Amino acid sequence: MELDALVQQVMARAFVELEASGRHVHVTEAQAVALFGHKLTPARELSQPGQFLAKERVTVIGPKGKFENVAVLGPERPEAQVEISLTDGRTLGITPPVRLSGNVEGTPGAVLEGPMGLVELRQGVLAAQRHMHVNSADAPNLGVHDKQKVKLQTYTQRPVIFPDVVVRVHPSFQTRVHLDYDEANACGFQNGDLGRVLP
């Protein structure tokens, strides 16, 4: 076996690429039309298949402050969601619960502003639970299964062990760990950094 292939095989068995996820918004098709006058327009693909960064941007408004030029991710979803960090929440005057994406029941709301209008969300603001997307083929090599919580060692400028990283396994996933900016800054994350699931 060639050295490069051997290195790749070892990496696949031990290490996972880290990604930092900044504040962003998911909207429904009706909300996209209300905010922008049309459905979302893809600007570039994201690491997870089928998902994209939209050309459109919104302002997220809370009781105490707002963030302008916030990224919108597509495609449209059945229910809106605003993913922010705990630090972002202080600026907005919102205390976001830590939840997995899609679990918006009972979360705080916010106002979204686009060029064509406003959308008031009664719920949907959360801080994303740190998690890892794992392709089904990689799960046995990493020794993980769907919905499992694992400890993750980061190999970053300021190495950290993160507990309670939720594993999500699916055949379409690219294997990646998603941290929010609070977590990424805490460990000194840079693009290309890796993590390892601890036994």
Map each language-model feature to its residues.
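Short beta-strand-centered segments at strand-helix junctions
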Residues: 19-63, 68-115, 120-147, 151-153, ...
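Short, low-complexity, charged amphipathic interaction modules
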Residues: 1-15
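C-terminal end-of-chain micro-motif
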Residues: 1, 198-199
